[in-house]
């Protein structure tokens, strides 16, 4: 009986869809196509540390040992938000590159050139996509995308672009604490102390900038974080869930199911 009822529901859905006007039918297909393309592009994360995901040692542990993330499907709106963020990154990077042509004392530095000139042998250039460079730190087993390096008024800075909604942007007073470890990881990789954050409202495209200075203590703490996680990996024991981890870190975590099992 239950099976027949379910078949009837599917028939009803098909019937309704067949009765839709072509413009609505097209829109539904467009939305679904966006989601299907995103699902096809989903891949298992590499077994490396990611600077943007180093706010929970247990999360890092699961990634390093290759635990399959929770299955999830992004809505077409979320896919659009991510794509919009990528587009904004490209436009801002291009605008920064054009500053020199407009007579300003600012130069957008090619990351691969910077790595070679500074003889940063631990860094491997994995790929380049436009103005973004994907790198791998061999000693730390860390992979990341870099928005860029600039030389502004004679000093080098790591450039990090962040897009956010208008509510977060309006209340933005400083660098988000969840981005501290990411900035520290970049500093450790490039040997530069200062990370220039530019936060962009994805709604009205206004911008705010903040400087984050990385200290030797911060870099040492991050190296200790990696070393501690590596020891858990070697012993095949999941680290305790940090008590200080922020709620949003848990909310956006891709390993919630496994984390609950490990208690």
Language-model-detected regions and their locations in the chain:
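Soluble or luminal CAZymes and related metallo-dependent hydrolases
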Residues: 84-88, 178, 221
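Short, glycine/acidic-rich beta->alpha junctions
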Residues: 140-141, 175-179
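Metal-dependent nuclease catalytic cores that hydrolyze phosphodiester bonds in DNA/RNA
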Residues: 1-158, 165
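Short beta-strand-loop-alpha-helix junction that forms the active-site gateway
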Residues: 161-174
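Short acidic (Asp/Glu) and glycine-rich catalytic loops that position anionic groups and cofactors
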Residues: 68-71, 163, 202-207
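Metal-dependent nuclease catalytic regions and adjoining charged, substrate-binding loops involved
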Residues: 1, 171-176, 189-263
């Amino acid at each position: 009986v239950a099976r027949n009822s379910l078949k009837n529901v599917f028939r009803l859905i098909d019937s309704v869809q067949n009765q839709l006007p072509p413009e609505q039918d097209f829109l539904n297909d467009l939305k679904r196509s966006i989601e299907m393309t995103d699902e096809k592009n989903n891949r298992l994360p590499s077994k490396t540390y990611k600077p943007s995901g180093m706010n929970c040692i247990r999360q890092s542990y699961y990634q390093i040992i290759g635990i399959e993330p929770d299955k999830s499907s992004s809505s077409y709106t979320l896919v659009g938000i991510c794509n919009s963020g990528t587009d904004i990154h490209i436009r801002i990077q291009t605008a920064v590159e054009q500053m020199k042509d407009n007579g300003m004392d600012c130069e957008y530095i090619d990351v691969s050139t910077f790595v070679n000139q500074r003889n940063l042998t631990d860094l491997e250039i994995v790929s380049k996509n436009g103005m973004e460079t994907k790198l791998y730190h061999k000693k730390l087993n860390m992979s990341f995308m870099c928005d860029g390096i600039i030389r502004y008024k004679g000093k080098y800075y790591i450039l990090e672009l962040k897009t956010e909604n208008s509510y977060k942007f309006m209340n933005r007073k400083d660098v988000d604490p969840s981005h501290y470890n990411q900035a520290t990881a970049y500093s450790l990789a490039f040997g530069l102390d200062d990370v220039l954050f530019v936060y962009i409202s994805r709604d009205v495209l206004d911008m705010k900038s903040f400087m984050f200075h990385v200290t030797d203590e911060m870099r040492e703490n991050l190296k200790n974080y990696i070393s501690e996680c590596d020891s858990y990996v070697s012993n095949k024991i999941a680290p305790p869930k940090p008590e200080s981890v922020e709620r949003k870190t848990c909310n956006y975590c891709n390993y919630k199911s496994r984390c609950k099992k490990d208690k």
